[in-house]
Swiss-Prot record:
Protein name, UniProt field: Ribosome-binding factor A
Organism: Streptococcus agalactiae
Biological processes annotated in GO: maturation of SSU-rRNA
Domain of life: Bacteria
Name of the encoding gene: rbfA
InterPro entries: KH_dom-like_a/b, RbfA, RbfA_dom_sf, Ribosome-bd_factorA_CS
Lineage: Bacteria, Bacillati, Bacillota, Bacilli, Lactobacillales
Assembly behavior: Monomer. Binds 30S ribosomal subunits, but not 50S ribosomal subunits or 70S ribosomes.
Length: 116
């Protein structure tokens, strides 16, 4: 049962953070950021927030990370307004590499088809 609650809280935080980034954070560094997943610690004290950015430039990725870290206070404050939780978890933003990894595998498979 506790695991189900952790998953629900993670999904709610994912939805809310996407909404907050879209409507409340006016930082151009995070305009193209999309939250892909949220993993919660068992005691709900920490949320690892995975994100992607629509740019492949390393400088844009770094700027997005800095922008998210700067906006953490605003995001937590807005989460506190929108969620009915005793304590809002600490947020750790991590770039989601799974989409890039999947794209790389797709490209390798396409190259295999071309060679045959």
């Amino acid at each position: 049962m506790a695991n189900h609650r952790i998953d629900r809280v993670g999904m709610e935080i994912k939805r809310e953070v996407n909404e907050i980034l879209r409507l409340r954070v006016n930082d151009p560094r995070v305009q193209d950021v999309t939250i892909t997943d949220v993993q919660m610690l068992g005691d709900l004290s920490m949320a690892k927030v995975f994100y992607t950015i629509h740019s492949t430039l390393a400088s844009d990725n770094q700027k997005a990370q800095i922008g998210l870290e700067k906006a953490t206070g605003t995001i937590k404050r807005e989460l506190g307004k929108n969620l009915t939780m005793y304590k809002i978890p600490d947020l750790q933003f991590v770039k989601d590499e799974s989409i890039e990894y999947g794209n790389k595998i797709d490209e390798m498979l396409r190259n295999l088809d071309k060679k045959d």
